[in-house]
């Protein structure tokens, strides 16, 4: 008979063990196991952190009795997490680690690709066969015929970066441009400020005029929201700029709802008003900026009336917004990712990032721009222990943009073509644009597809081999953050269930089977964690492997008053904020509307937004959990009543959403959250949850952004008919 350790623990058993007490937000610890036996039980508590692609990076504690989880709760030692987990993670052990459908043994395909038919095999057989196939491809066509595909499914530096990156660099595989999220935003802010780190999250409480531009913290940055609420209670005004009336927009003092893709024009229009009305901080501009004369000339054509025609806003709205922002102190603009997914994505961030310098907002504590914090960790941690630049830079191989995966898999002119796709920490069948092309590529009989996964995802269904990956409760890791100032260590709470293994161990085994002997391919997880912390940088003062094991997460040792640009100190080539940069084309952020052909305009008149509206998904993670699907309901399309009436569509009608790339079937929901001409579809649902087996990305474009080579997926036009 197999033990629980061999087969995993199903949902009912785990709930019984945990006493059915609440796990996570606001609830006390799950009661520990008790026994009338005289045997002594071993109880331990370890610290960990969320590995998802989220700015919060929550810290948690896991208590076990005899290697069985009895409590999973947020850590109160991290003031940013503040003893609460987000809605997605409160039941993580049941939802992921102990889920009855979790893959716990290697699998080999026995049916057609996409059918989801597999047989169980041993690790020895799986490693032997995959290593042989990879080596054969290398011998015949070179390492570039192999493409690794991963992203933010696990943002741990060990399981997401270290050994996997070293392995693929060692075999000379094609490099993946991981630009699907964040690259355009970063490129834009760097062009203006030279760095993305601005106002720190906790310091938003000192702001008195907060602009949440293209971000929805109540849903996707939940631990920032209490700080925003505190600022509001202290008198701050909350303004949301978003083409969709999000959960956060509904709670704001003012929701400004421009047409999708017009953020650059709006930001330039604000600068026009500020300069025309003399509301700029001329002293700050003279001391710490470059190119204001060119900017003044450039924004002349972005007067309120012209910008109103572009954005769909009233000229009075643009005037009022510009004046209120410029005349409020401290004023803060919070951006994250949202507005990057347009053709002008980087230009939008570039323009918005100029506003704090134009008004001198950086002078004031709580004033400026809040974006990402990852640079703080890049400066302080020993990144070379993770990246081993001498390994990753040799050999220099070609790069393939992850947004263009569908094109790459089907490109007959690509030399060498992609003969092997190795997917981990990602689910590209759902999350990558131009889905039809991606699925067509995954169906190719001569493509070797290997996937490391927890579940039989839509991507895994096309795999030739599936390796069972551990969850964060079962492996070591160290996690920085791109949205907070806390670093976390993740200590395994339990031994790996079944035959699951960490990503790092998978690639160590492959390296050994392929005959490699280089020590950097076999370094242990715990050694990588320790080496990463071996830095004498001031930000890491007082932070050690031992202290992190004790506390879980610690705040970087930053100045009490973090005001990076109060006196300039921009990380640009000049040391100043760049309104104008001759080294970048265009030299000023410019709104360039996407031009659609006349036929496309006529056939696909509606602008599709695919956004994070599901509260309990994290991209496509957790979308296979029954109780979460019950809460979220079936996927739906939000459409303005006037657009619905013009198509004889009533609330609840099943509709077909289509364009030249594909079609999706789902129910219509009449909504005032979108404006006329705009429709909205949630992202994250799996293909099986749609009639027809296609989700939102069957419609999205793989057009690249103006800078950063990100995905302009929101530049998607569609038409809708009632089924």
Specify the residue positions occupied by each region the protein language model found.
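N-terminal export/assembly segments and adjacent metallocofactor-ligating motifs
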Residues: 2-277, 306, 314, 424, ...
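Active-site phosphate/pyrophosphate-binding segments
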Residues: 270, 290-405
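Acidic/polar loop patches that form or flank catalytic/metal-binding clefts of enzymes
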Residues: 25, 70, 281-282, 318, ...
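Glycine-rich phosphate/diphosphate-binding loops that line cofactor/substrate pockets in enzymes
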Residues: 127-146, 200-208, 298, 319-332, ...
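N-terminal leader/propeptide and maturation segments of large enzyme subunits in energy/redox metabolism
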Residues: 109-120, 279-315, 494-566, 631, ...
């Amino acid at each position: 008979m197999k033990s629980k350790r061999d087969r995993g623990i199903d949902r009912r058993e785990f709930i019984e063990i945990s006493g059915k007490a609440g796990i996570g937000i606001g609830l006390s610890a799950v009661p520990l196991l008790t026994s009338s036996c005289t045997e002594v039980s071993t109880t331990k508590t370890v610290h960990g952190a969320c590995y998802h692609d989220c700015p919060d990076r929550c810290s948690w504690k896991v208590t076990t009795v005899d290697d069985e989880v009895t409590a999973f709760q947020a850590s109160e030692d991290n003031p940013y997490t503040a003893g609460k987990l987000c809605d997605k993670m409160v039941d993580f052990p049941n939802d992921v680690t102990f889920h009855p459908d979790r893959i716990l043994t290697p699998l080999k395909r026995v049916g057609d690709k996409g059918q989801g038919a597999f047989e169980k095999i041993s690790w020895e057989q799986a490693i032997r066969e995959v290593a042989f196939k990879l080596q054969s491809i290398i011998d015949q066509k070179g390492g570039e015929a192999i493409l690794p595909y991963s992203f933010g499914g696990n943002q741990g530096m060990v399981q997401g970066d270290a050994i996997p990156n070293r392995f693929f660099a060692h075999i000379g595989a094609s490099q993946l441009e991981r630009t699907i999220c964040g690259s355009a935003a970063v490129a834009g802010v760097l062009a203006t400020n030279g760095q993305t780190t601005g106002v720190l999250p906790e310091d938003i409480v000192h702001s008195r005029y907060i602009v949440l531009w293209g971000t929805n913290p109540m849903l996707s940055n939940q631990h920032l929201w209490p700080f925003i609420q505190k600022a509001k209670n202290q008198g701050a005004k909350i303004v949301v700029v978003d083409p969709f009336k999000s959960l956060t927009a509904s709670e704001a003092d003012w929701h400004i709802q421009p047409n999708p893709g017009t953020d650059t024009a709006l930001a330039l229009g604000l600068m026009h008003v500020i300069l025309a009305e003399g509301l700029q901080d001329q002293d700050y501009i003279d001391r710490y900026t470059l190119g204001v004369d060119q900017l003044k000339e450039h924004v002349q054509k972005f007067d309120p009336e012209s910008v109103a025609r572009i954005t769909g806003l009233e000229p009075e709205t643009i005037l009022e917004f510009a004046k209120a922002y410029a005349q409020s102190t401290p004023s803060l603009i919070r951006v994250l990712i949202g507005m990057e997914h347009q053709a002008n994505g980087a230009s939008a961030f570039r323009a918005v990032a100029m506003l704090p310098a134009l008004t001198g907002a950086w002078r004031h504590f709580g004033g400026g721009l809040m974006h990402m914090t990852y640079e703080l960790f890049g400066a302080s941690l020993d990144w070379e222990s993770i990246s081993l630049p001498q390994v990753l830079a040799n050999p220099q191989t070609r790069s393939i943009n992850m947004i263009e995966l569908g094109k790459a898999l089907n490109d007959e002119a690509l030399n060498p073509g992609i003969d092997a796709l190795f997917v981990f920490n990602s689910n590209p069948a759902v999350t990558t644009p131009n889905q039809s092309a991606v699925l067509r590529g995954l169906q190719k009989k001569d493509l070797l597809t290997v996937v490391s996964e927890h579940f039989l995802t839509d991507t895994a269904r096309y795999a030739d081999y599936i390796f069972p990956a551990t969850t964060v409760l079962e492996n070591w890791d160290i996690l920085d953050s791109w949205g907070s100032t806390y670093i976390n260590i993740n200590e395994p709470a339990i031994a790996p269930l079944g035959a699951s293994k960490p990503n790092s161990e998978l690639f160590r085994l492959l390296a050994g089977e392929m005959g490699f002997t280089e020590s950097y391919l076999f370094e242990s997880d715990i050694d990588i964690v320790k080496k990463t912390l071996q830095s004498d940088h001031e930000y890491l003062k007082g932070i050690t492997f031992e202290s992190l094991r004790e506390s879980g997460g610690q705040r970087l040792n930053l100045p009490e008053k973090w005001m990076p640009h109060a006196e300039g100190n921009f990380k640009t080539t000049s040391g100043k904020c760049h309104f104008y940069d001759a080294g970048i084309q265009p030299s000023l952020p410019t709104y360039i509307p996407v031009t659609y052909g006349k036929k496309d305009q006529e056939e696909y008149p509606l602008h599709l937004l695919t956004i994070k509206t599901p509260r309990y998904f994290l991209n496509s993670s957790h979308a296979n959990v029954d109780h979460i699907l019950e809460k979220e309901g079936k996927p739906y399309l939000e459409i303005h009543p006037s657009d619905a009436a013009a198509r004889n569509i009533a609330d609840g009608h099943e509709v077909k959403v289509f364009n030249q790339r594909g079609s999706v079937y789902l129910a219509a929901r009449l909504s005032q959250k979108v404006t006329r001409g705009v429709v909205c579809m949630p992202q994250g649902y799996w293909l099986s949850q749609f009639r027809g087996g296609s989700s939102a990305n069957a419609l999205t474009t793989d057009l690249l952004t103006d800078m950063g080579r990100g995905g302009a997926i929101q530049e998607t036009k569609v038409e809708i008919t009632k089924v």
